[in-house]
Amino acid sequence: DGIADASKKFSDATYPIAEKFDWGGSSAVAKYIADASASNPRQAALAVEKLLETGLTMDPKLVRAAVAAHSKALDTAVSNPKLVASKEDFAAVNEALARMIASADKQKFAALRTAFPESRELQSSLFAGNNGYEAEKAYDSFKALTSAVRDASINGANAPVIAEAARSERYVPDGPVGRAAKKFSEATYPIMEKLNWVKSPEISKYLATASSKDPKMMAPGIDKTLEVALTMNQNLINNAVYAHVRAIKGALNTPGFVAERDDFARVNLALAKMIGSADPAKFKALLTAFPGNADLQMALFAANPEQAKAAYETFVALTSAVV
């Protein structure tokens, strides 16, 4: 079909560029991760919200297929010094993404092109050192693929149905997981609301250094995350995504980007239920999958040791309820 043909031509044209790129040690990518949200935090938060909203208009089966394609590509990439996937896996990822995008709401997806701060500068940096002919050929194939996706668009027709609670509706937990999630939220919210999510030095430092410091560890961590997601209930994933969208909308109205208490609780409950649907062994492996994760958590809770202890106890109880 049109997407298959166009995505193959796009992959053929772009792989020579992709395989020359050092995905693990790129200063351009590391700099963007470190600087983009810090330079324009509100736009970055809005972009994440738009990204999640667009994801909720996509066909869940095609989203799952794209996740699986990325996971397979990472399996081959981690054995490459530059974290470059095989040409076959690279092509499979591009086709899966094209089909997934074709299922999205066209207007919402189009808005993503300019949603992230300084994304044009990042793209320019990535292509600056490439052969001009190769870059032009890649861009032409990208335009052709864009046209094929546009022609195949179903404009969100297969989007999942999500039951939306009115913002005025109070959060009422139900069942053992719900009650444990409520206690966890009550114990952790006093800590969370004191954090400045716009300018937190601990989070900025982690984002700036984790992937560039140890890319060979970060890539397997992402791969394991994708593998775990493939074992989860899709409806519960959708509910967790929607809970985050709702929380971000409320957080954007506060100086430190802190979500409202009820939205924070809804996010925790949605995540707990989603995690409860995952393969237990695969999820447990995530606890130590990302480099520096334990150090980040210690830094975030160091300012409030007494509250942190109480929060940890409710976390243990929530974990028991979920598992």
Swiss-Prot record:
Site (Chlorophyll a binding): 70, 244
Name this protein carries in UniProt: Peridinin-chlorophyll a-binding protein 3
Binding partners and assembly: Homotrimer.
Entry keyword set: Chlorophyll, Chloroplast, Chromophore, Light-harvesting polypeptide, Plastid, Repeat
Domain comment as written in the entry: The mature protein is composed of 2 almost identical repeat units.
Keyword Repeat: yes
InterPro entries: Peridinin-chlorophyll-bd_prot, Peridinin-chlorophyll-bd_sf
Any GO CC annotation of this UniProt entry: light-harvesting complex
Organism the protein comes from: Amphidinium carterae (Dinoflagellate)
Cited function: Water-soluble antenna for capture of solar energy in the blue-green range. Peridinin is an asymmetric carotenoid.
MF terms in GO: chlorophyll binding
Cell location: Plastid, Chloroplast
